[in-house]
Every structure is written in structure tokens, then in C-alpha cells.
Amino acid sequence: MAEAVNNEQQGPQFNIQRVYTKDISFETPNSPAVFQKEWNPEVKLDLDTRSAKLADDVYEVVLSLTVTAKNGEETAFLCEVQQAGIFAISGLTDQQLAHSLGAYCPNVLFPYAREAVGSLVARGTFPQLNLAPVNFDALFAQYVQQRQAQAEAAGEAAEANA
């Protein structure tokens, strides 16, 4: 019986220790002139994730969102949010850990970042902005494929030079 309890404790563990805003910025470089024009924006979303090991089985993951809205040729607003979290993760293979840090944790952080962006845009008196959900699993799979292709290309180049 005690052996079964130990096996359960040794299984995969995932705990959110903290979710917080690491950095936030909102700029309206062409105000107040931007408010005098018809509103027909082109909105661009750039996102990035990074992770760092803080201690054994404890990681910080930072999701960075940059939203740029242009109205014609002028930038209406630029919103930058770094939403971070501290996660305790153990009992995973290296591949599972990489997926957790690169896809699952950003999925946890994205709703907080999306809310922060929406709030900043509203405080700037711009029309409501609702960011569409992001498929971090697909983005992570694409990243893994790119890394594999780069590794294969590097291996082929090394063989050609040998």
C-alpha cells in the first residue's frame, strides 16, 4: 500500500504557484490626431514565450504580447504585455517538460494577457479589442519541426564538409 502511495507521488505534478504581470506598456504616439480620423485599424499581434529554471522543478514562463494598431499609415496604439507565471513541474520526461513550458504554460497565461491588453486598449479610449484564442500546441509543434529541420540541415552540411 505504501508503495502505491509513493508511486502516485512520483507521477507527473503540475502546480501554478503564481501568475503575475511582469511588464506592461501602452503608447498612443499620434494622439490626439488619431482620434479625429475614421477608425479602420489594421491590428498586428506578435507573441513570444520564454522560460527559465528558478529552482529544482520550478520554472518561470513569460508570455510576451505586442499589439500594434495602425490606422492608415499612422500607429494608433502600441500595447506590450509580459504576463508571467511560476510553475512547479515534476515527473515529466524532457520532451513532456518542453511541451509544458512551450505550450501548456502559455495557454494558462494567455487569458490574463488578453484581459490586460483589452483593459489597456479600453483605457486608451479605443474600441474594444478581443484577441482571438491562440493554439500554443500548434505553435510549439511548428517550433519543434523547425528545430528538427535545422538540425538535419546542419547534419547534412557537416557530412558534406567531412
Swiss-Prot record:
BP GO terms, sorted: protein folding; protein tetramerization; protein transport
Keywords in alphabetical order: Chaperone, Cytoplasm, Protein transport, Translocation, Transport
Organism: Shewanella loihica (strain ATCC BAA-1088 / PV-4)
Signal peptide from the UniProt entry: none
Assembly, per entry: Homotetramer, a dimer of dimers. One homotetramer interacts with 1 SecA dimer.
Pfam family, one: SecB
InterPro entries: SecB (IPR003708), SecB-like_sf (IPR035958)
Keyword hit for Repeat: no
UniProt superkingdom: Bacteria
GO cellular component terms, A-Z: cytoplasm
HAMAP family (alphabetical): SecB
PANTHER family: PROTEIN-EXPORT PROTEIN SECB (PTHR36918:SF1), PTHR36918
Family: Belongs to the SecB family.
Main location: cytoplasm
Protein name: Protein-export protein SecB
Compartments reported by the entry: Cytoplasm
Summary of the function given for this chain in its UniProt record: One of the proteins required for the normal export of preproteins out of the cell cytoplasm. It is a molecular chaperone that binds to a subset of precursor proteins, maintaining them in a translocation-competent state. It also specifically binds to its receptor SecA.
MF terms in GO: unfolded protein binding
